[in-house]
Amino acid sequence: MIQIDQLRRLLGLFLVAALAPVAHAQDAQVTRMRAALAAPDRPAENKARDADRKPVETMQFLGIKTGNTVVDMIAAGGWFTEVLSAAVGPTGKVYAQNPPFLVQADAEKALLARLGNAEPVHVQLEAAGIVGKADVVVTALNLHDVYNGYGDQPGGESAAVAFLRSIYGALKPGGVLGVIDHVGVTGRDNKSLHRMLPQQARDAITKAGFTIEAESPLLAHSGDDHSKNVFDPAIRGKTDQFVIRARKPR
């Protein structure tokens, strides 16, 4: 008859054997990411942002895996596109979505050619045929503009919910939404500061149909008192940011 101690040892060995492939895959992904982010052809200005943006840790928190299909929603200059490209590896796919007015054609072409596993999207995800096919969609430092309104767009919670619903449609059942944005506080003019209340983001995310799984303090910055515009040289690149991971129901 197997004794309790023997059973515990056997169970421990089983768990080690079962988890070893997962740990190996995670180690390989981290090694690949660090190599890609340190590559000599990566722009120095992008590398300089890594210390504050913690790309490897952020990708791990969002649960992005090798081989995933991911969307960088409103990719702008493509810093996150490059990070996502490294995270999913050569067997994965990155869609760098930008509205036409944000497209920097020459820079985008050079970036995507260098990455090899990414392609541009200059229309809404549904129009591009990205429906129910993404494992993860990340929107970084954009939701505040949708919520606060920009250009001739009125903004408000309804605008944010509609934006997030378009992401919901792009995701597979069980897919992940990652939202990163500048923290705003009550009593400030968050529109002019390019910020939003974390609770505004939470409310819009849940009303769009997602379940919030976790939030991370990875990008919190205590030196930001939330009173300055995020483009103020005193805090640019070092703003206090919230990171939310949410999931589309299976």
Model-derived features with residue positions:
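Class I SAM-dependent methyltransferase Rossmann-like catalytic core
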Residues: 29-65
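A short SAM/SAH-binding and catalytic strip from SAM-dependent methyltransferases
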Residues: 134-160
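Core SAM-dependent methyltransferase catalytic element
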Residues: 208, 225-250
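Conserved beta-strand signature within the Rossmann-like core of class I S-adenosyl-L-methionine
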Residues: 164, 174-183
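A short glycine-rich, Lys/Arg-flanked "PGG" loop and its adjoining helix->strand segment in the class I
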Residues: 85-86, 154-173
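S-adenosyl-L-methionine
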Residues: 103-131
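A short acidic, Gly/Pro-enriched loop at the edge of an enzyme's catalytic core
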Residues: 68, 115, 128-141
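Conserved class I S-adenosyl-L-methionine
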Residues: 66-76
